[in-house]
Amino acid sequence: MSTENDYIVADIGLADFGRKEITIAETEMPGLMACRAEFGETKPLKGARITGSLHMTIQTAVLIETLVALGAEVRWASCNIFSTQDHAAAAIAASGVPVYAIKGESLEDYWIYTDKIFQWADGGFSNMILDDGGDATMYILLGARAEAGEDVLSDPHSEEEEILFAQIKKRLKASPGWFTKQRDAIKGVTEETTTGVNRLYQLSQKGLLPFPAINVNDSVTKSKFDNKYGCKESLVDGIRRATDVMMAGKVAVVCGYGDVGKGSAASLSGAGARVKVTEVDPICALQAAMDGYEVVLLEDVVSSADIFISTTGNKDVIRIDHMRAMKDMAIVGNIGHFDNEIQVAALRNLKWTNVKPQVDLIEFAKGNRIILLSEGRLLNLGNATGHPSFVMSASFTNQTLAQIELFTKPGQYQNQVYVLPKHLDEKVARLHLGKLGVKLTELSGEQAAYIGVTPQGPFKSDHYRY
């Protein structure tokens, strides 16, 4: 572990390796490079102090260096204990950006690192949060509520909550009043993923959101690309790296058919698996059926399928009774944000055999075993390297534009959750067309008038479903 200066990474000696991969990734991330070209001189993020909690990968390194190029000061940690790419973290730390991220870090370290990305050397405060899953935002808001006298730390419902609450109490004791001051310094948060967005909307509905938020996840150029096409490539990559299993002919069950589920089903189907889908939403279920997938109850296929993937963003999707009934050596994994989609805690009293990092064999009393990937956390990042650079460029360009929007327009946004305007969504798409050799047809003035748009766009209404 390398801990000198203002960073904690696995091995700072990996920085050169990380830098080489960052250089390659930059050629696949035209949106972020275009942001540097457009905003690099004016530096609209000058004065921004961004706390970032997002998977510390090579692609994220390109995002971080884009934010810095636009004038921001940045402190960073990963939003998942298994998703860090240690050479990426080393390269960013070596560049002078404080990073706290190690692949396979403990939950205790995870929350310590989340605290550290708010601790500036001069004692100042972060004024922006760039979040993935909402943990950094939740950390500050829970602490501030505790300082206000609310009883929010006395009843943890999981091991992770117990560890989180202990870290908040530690900071409360060390720095009384700090959480409230940090909360009040935040100008806005930009949130990357469905799970974190749901948290923000819940806060907003209860009147508990103390600063504006931009829902990056629901930008079309994020959810319809990162969630779908990213998962389409990275899910099978993770399963193969973890197990070396042949997927052709296997029966795979995808729990959920939202954008992530659609990409996951396509990923497995493309590898030759026979895919079945479970759903609670009648619209998504109908989509799955008309896409050619059998829509089933998990209970009806749990003893016959070979691979189970949860994609829902909900909890207790694959339960202990499901796993107990699975065939010997069934593969169980999750590509939703948190590990509680699978009841991993209920497996802890069984026999675990670690096969290799993030691959565990778990044996039930009757002798059947399951292969659990990444302890139920994101397997595409835990067992592989996540989505490809190109699709992450679209997501991270949205993040960059959202950070600029909130930081440069104080007072224009209320304490609510917003999405980026359509013209910026279309801008993100345009920035990625050239890399693929795409040529856009242009509307004539008469054609544009006929459908009620301008020749330059936006071309669709805000409620259009792509």
Curated annotation (Swiss-Prot):
Q: Does the keyword Hydrolase apply?
A: yes
Family, similarity comment: Belongs to the adenosylhomocysteinase family.
GO MF annotation terms: adenosylhomocysteinase activity
Function per UniProt: May play a key role in the regulation of the intracellular concentration of adenosylhomocysteine.
Keywords, A to Z, come to: Cytoplasm, Hydrolase, NAD, One-carbon metabolism
Q: Which reaction does it catalyse?
A: S-adenosyl-L-homocysteine + H2O = L-homocysteine + adenosine
State where NAD(+) binds: 193-195, 227, 256-261, 279, 314, 335-337, 380
Quote the PROSITE patterns the UniProt record gives. Answer: ADOHCYASE_1, ADOHCYASE_2
A Pfam match: AdoHcyase
Q: Where in the cell is it found?
A: Cytoplasm
Organism listed in the record: Rhizobium rhizogenes (strain K84 / ATCC BAA-868) (Agrobacterium radiobacter)
- Give GO cellular component annotations, separated by semicolons: cytosol
Q: What is this protein called?
A: Adenosylhomocysteinase
Q: Which GO terms describe its biological process?
A: L-homocysteine biosynthetic process; one-carbon metabolic process; S-adenosylmethionine cycle
Tell me the residue numbers annotated for binding substrate.
57, 132, 192, 222, 226
Q: In which pathway does it act?
A: Amino-acid biosynthesis; L-homocysteine biosynthesis; L-homocysteine from S-adenosyl-L-homocysteine: step 1/1
Asked if the Swiss-Prot or TrEMBL record annotates the protein with the keyword Nucleotide-binding, the reply is no
- List the PANTHER family hit by this protein, alphabetically: ADENOSYLHOMOCYSTEINASE
What cofactors are annotated for this protein?
NAD(+)
SMART domains given for it? AdoHcyase, AdoHcyase_NAD
Cofactor binding comment, as recorded: Binds 1 NAD(+) per subunit.
User: What EC identifiers does the entry list?
Assistant: 3.13.2.1
